[in-house]
């Protein structure tokens, strides 16, 4: 279902399909051809968000190295770091933090990446986020 929404929302570029399939060579070709790395699908998700969703660490690294916005939010205000934290993908969380992802970004429910890591019982990810200044959303809202 996600792929259908993705492809329907984007039209011309096939970077979405290449990212979903984990086709590194094709994604590299798209990047070299000047693909818009911050283009959004109908739900506001970028190629980087999909690379995180499908857990393609090498593609996440490629997109980040080529200027993809690590803090771009989709319609529910969730960033790639929220998603990586929810998935408990500690390598991806490290990469995104190193690339400047906002550790305390709030989503539409006032949740932070730490809230997502804690809520999905990813304790190692939660510890990493805390070490990098991560707080729960309730601590950030007056």
What are these regions (language model features)?
Residues 1-7:
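Bacterial N-terminal signal peptides
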Residues 23-31, 56-64, 89-97, 122-131:
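Ankyrin repeat structural motif
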Residues 17-22, 50-56, 83-89, 116-122:
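Ankyrin repeat A-helix N-terminal signature
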Residues 17-66:
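Post-signal-peptide N-terminal segment of Sec-exported extracytoplasmic proteins
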């Amino acid at each position: 279902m996600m792929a259908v929404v993705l492809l329907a929302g984007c039209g011309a570029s096939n970077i979405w399909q290449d990212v979903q399939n984990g086709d590194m060579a094709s994604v590299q070709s798209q990047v070299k051809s000047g693909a818009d790395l911050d283009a959004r699908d109908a739900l506001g998700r970028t190629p980087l968000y999909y690379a995180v969703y499908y857990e393609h660490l090498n593609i996440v690294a490629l997109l980040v190295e080529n200027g993809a916005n690590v803090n771009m939010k989709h319609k529910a205000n969730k960033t790639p770091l929220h998603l990586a934290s929810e998935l408990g993908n500690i390598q991806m969380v490290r990469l995104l933090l190193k690339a400047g992802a906002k550790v305390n970004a709030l989503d539409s429910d006032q949740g932070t990446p730490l809230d997502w890591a804690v809520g999905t019982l990813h304790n190692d990810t939660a510890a990493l986020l805390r070490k990098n200044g991560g707080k729960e959303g309730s601590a950030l809202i007056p």
